[in-house]
Amino acid sequence: MNLKNRLILEDYRKQRDDFIRLGDVVHNMLTDIVDSMGITVLGIEHRVKTEKSLAGKLERNGDWYSSFEDLTDILGARVICFFSDEIDKIGKKVEEAFVIDWENSSDKRALIKADTFGYLSLHYICSLPFGDRWPDEICGKKFEIQIRTTLQHTWAAINHDLGYKSEFGVLVVWHENFRELPDFWKLPMMSSSGCAMI
């Protein structure tokens, strides 16, 4: 590992506790957002990237990052909802509650390739605003929020286990067969009002 990546890991070790604190704040804020909207979700989760995971990322893609501050996914949070129209509703509240880095945020739901279905989430790169509400140590640090449906979440997990952990990958025909299952498609294609999303 080169000197630059070693320095990034050193900064990670120094700031890891701040990201752990930030994760708790973000989790609580997302919980409050969902509760205030009266939306029932499958879950809200967050994680701080481990040093081992970060080291592996730097080994694979280290040239993309010139400093620790270039990394936007040290902390990742996710809201898993039941209906597709709830993604945008929750997203609007996220945009109001956090500082959004629009340049690096993305809406991946326009993708329709079989091997990308599990990643069709709404992805925000966020930070907390500076002020009196939170300690300066956790404000301004970038983190990722994903909002996705239960099916997208399940498919991403399946794709990760069968795709990334298999040297042969996942057969495209398996992807296509999964996409054609009516019972799986029914839930995310329905709105929270019970009407089909066209």
Annotate the PLM regions.
Residues 1-77, 81, 85, 186:
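Charge-rich, low-complexity segments
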Residues 1-18, 22, 139-198:
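An acidic, glycine-/histidine-flanked metal-binding catalytic module
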Residues 30-41, 102, 132, 192, ...:
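Long, hydrophobic, amphipathic alpha-helical segments used as structural scaffolds
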Residues 75-77, 120-124, 141-143:
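Generic beta-strand structural signal
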Residues 81, 126-128, 147-149:
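Flexible glycine-/small-residue-rich
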Residues 89-90, 133-136, 153-156:
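Short helix/loop capping segments that flank catalytic or ligand/cofactor-binding pockets
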Residues 90-97:
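Short amphipathic alpha-helices in soluble, non-transmembrane regions
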Residues 101-128, 132-135:
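Short Gly/Thr-rich strand-loop-strand
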